[in-house]
Design a protein with these regions (language model features):
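Short hydrophobic alpha-helices and adjacent helix-cap/hinge residues
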Residues: 1-348
Length: 348
């Protein structure tokens, strides 16, 4: 689910960043330099006379601002890999301010603009980019289940022109339920509200339902065809229930869930710490900025000649647990010590 870009008012602990070294690039540079020393002066001057244009990266998402955390993470990661904004790469950013219907035309516009690569966030943007082109490489982030959504053929062999970073929505479903019920042990019914157009949500629902049975919880999936159904579905939520809000493509859906959660004092768990800053109780899932940095490695490889179909889809490397202590206090919940010790971020 794409969200408004904003500075996150979170206190972070135990950050783990996974960096990919540049040893191969350094070796290649050294061999090139040695070869140039053996050429006559005129041959050495030719590369200086031919300036290659920067790679053009198209960005497609449903964010409310150009400076979304995944995009900022991508820029930082590319810089670490020797591809600097303005010198080696430029960005054509198309964000649709939460309007999913505007995403397909934006994808087609990027293809017509002849970008070298399209960087997407969330399933709707990734699917639109895939529908718009079979030749321009696509690198995605924040897609919960790329195989289940039909975006790639498999994790190891994506096929086609698409690869990227999975946010592991299916794999993390049971853990989110566990965290939610640890914070609110009296809960017996959990509403799983999702956007029906996010096809990758279905495998996650199965995992959540299986986990609910083990925990003796009633898991009630509620799919929305569009935002107009949201009020009706949220109207069924009662005090004593809880909400599991999976990652999706509609930020309006998440904001509405937070508002309903606060109004009824109903605990809700989210897929990223970003929503804790808006009043959500707890989140367990990938960090947006870190996913952008991780995706930078795939982007750099493709810009330097690799094919997307040869680059396996990666799982998000950094998973954060975040708790809004103010919301917990509002709900009358005592945050267990084991949650406090494991949490990577807090909102006070």
């Amino acid at each position: 689910m794409m969200a408004p870009s904003s500075a996150r008012p979170l206190r972070r602990f135990g950050h783990q960043l996974f960096w990919v070294g540049a040893a191969i690039t350094v070796c290649a540079w050294a061999l090139t330099a040695q070869a140039q020393q053996q050429k006559p002066p005129q041959a050495q001057q030719e590369p200086q006379q031919q300036t290659r244009r920067p790679f053009r990266i198209g960005v497609l998402n449903a964010a409310w601002a150009a400076s979304h955390p995944t995009v900022e993470g991508l820029k930082a990661g590319l810089k670490e890999l020797g591809l600097e904004d303005g010198r080696d790469v430029t960005f054509d950013i198309r964000f649709t301010e939460g309007k999913l219907s505007a995403i397909p035309p934006a994808a087609e516009a990027l293809v017509k603009a002849r970008v070298d690569l399209i960087f997407t966030s969330q399933e709707a943007a990734t699917q639109a980019a895939k529908d718009a082109t079979e030749s321009v490489p696509i690198v995605f982030t924040l897609v919960g289940d790329p195989v289940g959504a039909g975006i790639v053929a498999s994790i190891a062999r994506p096929g086609g022109n698409v690869t990227g970073i999975s946010s592991l929505q299916t794999e993390l479903a049971a853990k989110r339920l566990e965290v939610l019920t640890t914070l609110a042990p009296a809960v017996r019914r959990v509403w799983l509200i999702y956007y029906q157009l996010d096809l990758g949500t279905q495998p996650m629902i199965v995992k959540a339902f299986e986990a609910g049975q083990r925990m003796k919880l009633e898991v009630s999936p509620k799919g929305l065809a569009d935002a107009t159904e949201l009020k009706r579905v949220l109207g069924e939520v009662r005090r004593g229930d809880a909400i599991l809000a999976p990652e999706g493509s509609s930020p309006e859906l998440t904001i509405a869930i937070i508002e309903r959660s606060l109004a009824l004092k109903v605990p809700a768990a989210f897929g990223t710490a970003l929503w804790i800053g808006y009043g959500g109780l707890v989140s367990y899932g990938p960090d947006y900025y870190a996913q952008g940095m991780q995706a930078a490695t795939l982007v750099a490889k493709i810009l330097r000649g690799a094919k997307p179909q040869d680059l396996p889809v990666e799982g998000a490397e950094r998973i954060d647990l975040a708790v809004n202590l103010k919301t917990a206090d509002l709900f009358g919940l005592s945050v267990p010590r084991k949650i406090l010790l494991r949490a990577d971020a807090f909102r006070r």
